[in-house]
Each structure stands twice: as C-alpha cells, then as structure tokens.
C-alpha cells in the first residue's frame, strides 16, 4: 500500500485516480497515492469538448490521471479535473506512477522480511530518500550500483539497508522493447492538421494506464501522409497488444472524424 506524508493532496497536484462510480453529473474516484481517498470529478471537468455520454469517457475501475482543483481541509473533501491535465503532464505522471508501483513492491517485500509494517517502510525509507534526493526509487537504484552510502546519507536506519539493497537488485529496470507500425493519415477536412492531432490524442487515451508495462508511446510523421507509431515497454506481449490497440483506435476514431487512416506495416 502506498502511503503519503499528508492526509490530503494540494491544489494543482497531478495524481493517479481509479474511477469507482459514474453518474450523469460526474464521477467518484479514489486517489491511489492517498490511501484510496475519495474525490469528486464533476461533469464539467471531464472533457474540454462536448461529450454526449459521460460513460464514453469514464469507465469504472479504470485508472486516470487527474489534477486537484479544490481541497476543503475542514471537511476533508477533494475535487479533481480530467480536462485540466495536459498530455505532457499525463505522460510524466504515468512514468512516475510506474516508479511508485515498483518502489511500493520493494518496500512491501522488505517490510515482510523484517516483520515490520509497510507504513514503517514508507516513513523510514521512502520519505527519507524523497526528502534527500527527490525520487526514492532512483535513489535506491543508485544505491544498488554505488553502495549503501546513498541510503545512510539520507538517514535510512541500518536495519533496512542490507535487505533493501538485496531486494532492489532483483527489481532493477527491465530491458526495454520497442514495437513500431507505419500508417498513412489523410483528410480533406478544413484545419486538417488540427483534426489529425485530435484523432491521435483520442487514440492514445488510457493506453499507458491499461498496459502497466508500457513506458512510452509516440506517433509522429516521417513525411506526410506517412506516420510511425512507436510503443516502448518492458513486456513484448503488452507492447504488441498496445500497438494493435492504438492502430485500431486510430482507424475507428478516424472514421468518426472523417480522417482516412490505413496500415502500411505492423
């Protein structure tokens, strides 16, 4: 379980949330980095574009990246926005989330070995490393390569150091795999470039959340009308499935938006 130093998030914070209930007027989500704290996502904050049915955008149990827009510390309530998260913020958060999950797994296993609580692990290891270096998992990876001094300098208690380094060595960054596909994209619509960008953006929604091993996805022109789709991850099967899903999304959404998309090579 992931533990946060604070009971409530701060306004402007970018977080991972799990959609729990979807209503006509909005959705209740839980904030994964705050112990499953419930937050409200208003209908007006779901999309910057007109959406006929909120369930076309939000599906229960799906993870989404949200921005905190209101916090009432007296009542303990939080409101979040989906539409205020930029593509760059979403990409960075998904990468950070994968690191947090890896950190959580390491701390869970080490705390079990020591017969201590996971909260102890977060307080005595993760928070100390965060205070000293900013990114706990990167600090642990450095310690595996450079030695225990990295942990000692951050004030990590001695009891944690040896088992932490041993366990972390088993969870070092996995070898990356890359899957690519070529497509052609054509449209006779006015403002065609903007229309193509919108189709690509929609096609990529939730891909990195749906496939946990996916690290990065890029779609870019290699000379109009040809585009390359690159999927980078740590699991070949997931990377292949994600590539197929993206291309399928592109073709489907392209038809809806009068953008002709065809596969050249996968």
Swiss-Prot record:
Residue span(s) of domain S1 motif: 12-83
Signal sequence bounds: none
InterPro entries assigned to the protein according to its UniProt record, in alphabetical order: NA-bd_OB-fold, S1_domain, S1_IF2_alpha, TIF2_asu_arc, TIF2_asu_C, TIF2_asu_middle_sf, TIF_2_asu
Pfam families in the cross-refs: EIF_2_alpha, S1
Entries under PROSITE patterns matching the protein: S1
CDD domains assigned to the protein according to its UniProt record, in alphabetical order: S1_IF2_alpha
Transmembrane feature ranges: none
Domain of life: Archaea
SMART domains (alphabetical): S1 (SM00316)
GO molecular function: ribosome binding; RNA binding; translation initiation factor activity
UniProt entry keywords in alphabetical sequence: Initiation factor, Protein biosynthesis, RNA-binding
NCBIfam families: PRK03987.1-1
Homology family: Belongs to the eIF-2-alpha family.
Physiological role: eIF-2 functions in the early steps of protein synthesis by forming a ternary complex with GTP and initiator tRNA.
Assembly notes: Heterotrimer composed of an alpha, a beta and a gamma chain.
Protein name per the record: Translation initiation factor 2 subunit alpha
Organism: Saccharolobus islandicus (strain M.14.25 / Kamchatka #1)
